[in-house]
Structure formats: structure tokens, C-alpha cells
Amino acid sequence: MNEIIGKFAREGILIEDNAYFRLREMDDPASVSSELIVKIKSNGGKFTVLTSEMLDEFFEIDNPAEIKARGPLMVPAERDFDFEVISDTSNRSYTSGEIGDMIAYFNSRYSSLKNLLSKRPELKGHIPIADLRGGEDVVSIIGMVNDVRNTKNNHRIIELEDDTGEISVVVHNENHKLFEKSEKIVRDEVVGVHGTKKGRFVVASEIFHPGVPRIQEKEMDFSVAFISDVHIGSQTFLEDAFMKFVKWINGDFGSEEQRSLAADVKYLVVAGDIVDGIGIYPGQEKELLIRDIHEQYEEAARLFGDIRSDIKIVMIPGNHDSSRIAEPQPAIPEEYAKSLYSIRNIEFLSNPSLVSLDGVRTLIYHGRSFDDMAMSVNGLSHERSDLIMEELLEKRHLAPIYGERTPLASEIEDHLVIDEVPHVLHTGHVHINAYKKYKGVHLINSGTFQSQTEFQKIYNIVPTCGQVPVLNRGVMKLLEFS
């Protein structure tokens, strides 16, 4: 019960002994306590001491923000799910850690992205780098970026290599549009170049990414809710906001219009960091409310278990979860989350995963590579993860930069290549909501249910808490539960 007392204390509320003993005897004191805090705040937060008499009073007063259901939630008696896992690396992710695996990994990446680039009409006549001759021939080549740098005259040099050789590509700063485009090129991505061969260099006239075609909008007769970065077990986990979300999705919270939207939700997609984890960063134990990883997942099972069973929940791990650190991450191991695995409507998949939700191709990726992209590319930031997602789509790779903050497993196949263009790309990690529709693809970052951490305060990162994006029959809506 010290945890319950702490919950009230963090909200500036003390508990009299009689109220404490009554709470202790209740079936679910944690949930009741959270509900009481919500009710106290909704009444102006004027009470600083919770008494037994106030318990009686609160249980007789409806929260004005909470509308009691006027009958059962109107959802189909039996739902037919047309759910398909298109890509899940949980059981096909292998590496021995030998140098041969790393060579195979980069060969896989190069081959996959080269095939995509070769389909571009501008690169139909591309030739191997080793076949480049002297003179001033107009050429097209495809290669992996080995290095990117500026010269002392502020021209851009891109070192390209393929399976036959290497070449330096020059982008003149007088070509403003192309130079600006070249500033978004990062190491280890695969690009195509059209230009003129001049001595040891190719002077670029155009640079091509694998890119994405504009896709046709997918018709939907249902809704999908998206969340991520719940961080259960942290002292900064916003349990009250999460409980409001659960009540809403169950049809017990919100206006009639909001309850109608809840009834339409068929899928809930969770993009990682379900729990806060253990030993993720130095000093984390000081910020934990639950210091055992098994107990964190037990609490997660309690909270997610309250979500109505006619919603299919699709869940992947993030860097705070108990899966391995290197991407692609297999699904959360059952040995750490047995109670969570007992919830029959949860599908546990890898990070990343590609699924079909009644025909809506949904690519789910936690988003750790956003750190590398924000540090490497001018104009990209955590606050605008939609722009990062746009770049990753154009590069057709979820984590193009190797060897920086995002650990990548050197496997025989690169599973982070975006082979198939999704209708939805759902991410998390940065704790800041973002949305953009790009070439018909819904780019969604679902924010967090964790308030600002000490780390975020240092870097002035302001999270958007308790804001849940819902794709309502093809139209994006944002619900706030904070």
C-alpha cells in the first residue's frame, strides 16, 4: 500500500488512516486510487487530505468529464478480423556475429535497394562503378554511401561504392536545389546518381533515392487506435491518463461522439516501450516505481487486460522492453511477460513488423533510428518525427545509418529495408506526437503516456502526453487524455 500512498502524495494529497484502511480492503485499490485522483482533480483539486467521509461523497458524484454509458457499447456481437502478419522477424532473426554475417548484411541491403532503384526510369542504363571510363561521359550509377563530407570550398563529396568498386561524387554548391538534397544523404544508404564523369570524379546533376510512389488511399469501414511509450513501472508513468484511455476505448468515458468513435475501434497498435525496463540508462533505478521487470509486465497485463476483448491489440517491443537491444528486435519474450501473454487478444510481434489490418498495410517501428537521423541531418528533429519518417520512406530503410546510437544486428538479411510501401507507418520513441500524410501514406507518431523525465529536462524535450491518434475510417483524429 506504500505505492498507493505515494501515488496520492505525488499529487499533493494526504490520506487519513480510516480512508487508508478502507482503500486497502478494496478489490483493486490501485485502480480505485487512480479514479479518486481523477475525481479530486476534476473537482478543482481543493482537497489536500482524503478522509473516509470524502470517499463516500466521491463515490456518489459522477466526474463531469466522465459520461456513464447509457446501455452497452454498440459493437458487433462477433467481429471478423482479417488480420495478417506480413513480416515478423521474431523466429527468423539469426546472426553468429562473424565478419561474414556483416558482409552478407550489407550485401543484402545493397541488393534490395539497388533493385528498387533500378526500377526508376532515370536509372535504367546504370553501369557498375568499375566500368566507368575516363572522359566526360554522361553516366548513371547506383551505390552505397561510404562517406559524406564537405570540401574546403563547401562543395559536397559523396563516396559511393558498389560490389565492383568506389567513386567520389561531387555536388557543386552552385546547384542549390541538388546541394540541399545532398545534405540529407547519410552514410550506408543506397542512392542513384546521374552525372558527368570527370577524371576521378562524377559531377552529379541529379541524385535519386529508392523513393515511394503515391499510393491509392485504402478504404476503411473501421478505426485503429495507436499508442506507444507507455513506460509502465516508471514514476513518471501517467496511469490516470492511461486509465482514461482504457475507459474511453471500453465506451465508459467521453462524449457520445467520442464513445461512438470508441465503438468503431477494431485494432489497437502499440509501438513499443510498454514498460520502463531495468538498467536502460545510468541512475534509472531512482526513477522507477516498480524495480522488477517481471512485476512491470504484471502491471502491464493488469492495465491492458482491462481493454475489451473484441479489440485486437498488436504489440511490438521498444528499446526499454525486455527484448534484445539490437534491431530487428524479436517480440517481447514470454518468460518476462507471462501474464501479458495470457491475454488472448494481444498479438506479440517484432520491431519492426508489417501487418495487414483488414487490408490496411501497417508498418510498425519503435523509432530508435530517429536519434541518429536527427543528429546527422540538418533540419530534422525529434519534434518533427513526421519529417524523419518521410526521409526514411524515401530511403526505403528504417535505420539507414550503421554504427551510431541505434544498434543493428548484422544478419544475413537486412530486415529493416522497406520492401513494401505501407498504408500506415506507426512509430514512437521520441514521446512527441506527429502526423503527416505523405504520398498517400499515414505517418503517425503516437507520443507517450510518460511525463517529462529528468533526461528530457536536460535537453529541453517537452513530451506530448496522453494524446492518442485514431485513424477513423481513413481520417486522422487526436484524442487527449492528459
Curated annotation (Swiss-Prot):
A GO MF term: DNA binding
This enzyme's EC code(s): 2.7.7.7, 3.1.11.1
Keyword list, A-Z: DNA replication, DNA-binding, DNA-directed DNA polymerase, Exonuclease, Hydrolase, Multifunctional enzyme, Nuclease, Nucleotidyltransferase, Transferase
Pfam families, per database record: DNA_pol_E_B, tRNA_anti-codon
N-terminal signal peptide: none
UniProt key word Amino-acid biosynthesis: no
Superkingdom of origin: Archaea
The keyword Hydrolase is assigned to this record: yes
Swiss-Prot/TrEMBL catalytic activity: DNA(n) + a 2'-deoxyribonucleoside 5'-triphosphate = DNA(n+1) + diphosphate; Exonucleolytic cleavage in the 3'- to 5'-direction to yield nucleoside 5'-phosphates
InterPro entries documented for this protein: DNA_pol_a/d/e_bsu, DNA_pol_delta/II_ssu, Metallo-depent_PP-like, NA-bd_OB-fold, NA-bd_OB_tRNA, Pol2_small_arc
GO-annotated cellular components: DNA polymerase complex
One example of a Gene Ontology biological process annotation: DNA strand elongation involved in DNA replication
Family annotation (PANTHER family): DNA POLYMERASE DELTA SUBUNIT 2
Family affiliation: Belongs to the DNA polymerase delta/II small subunit family.
Quaternary structure note: Heterodimer of a large subunit and a small subunit.
Chain's role: Possesses two activities: a DNA synthesis (polymerase) and an exonucleolytic activity that degrades single-stranded DNA in the 3' to 5' direction. Has a template-primer preference which is characteristic of a replicative DNA polymerase.
Name assigned to this protein: DNA polymerase II small subunit
Native species: Methanothermobacter thermautotrophicus (strain ATCC 29096 / DSM 1053 / JCM 10044 / NBRC 100330 / Delta H) (Methanobacterium thermoautotrophicum)
Originating gene: polB
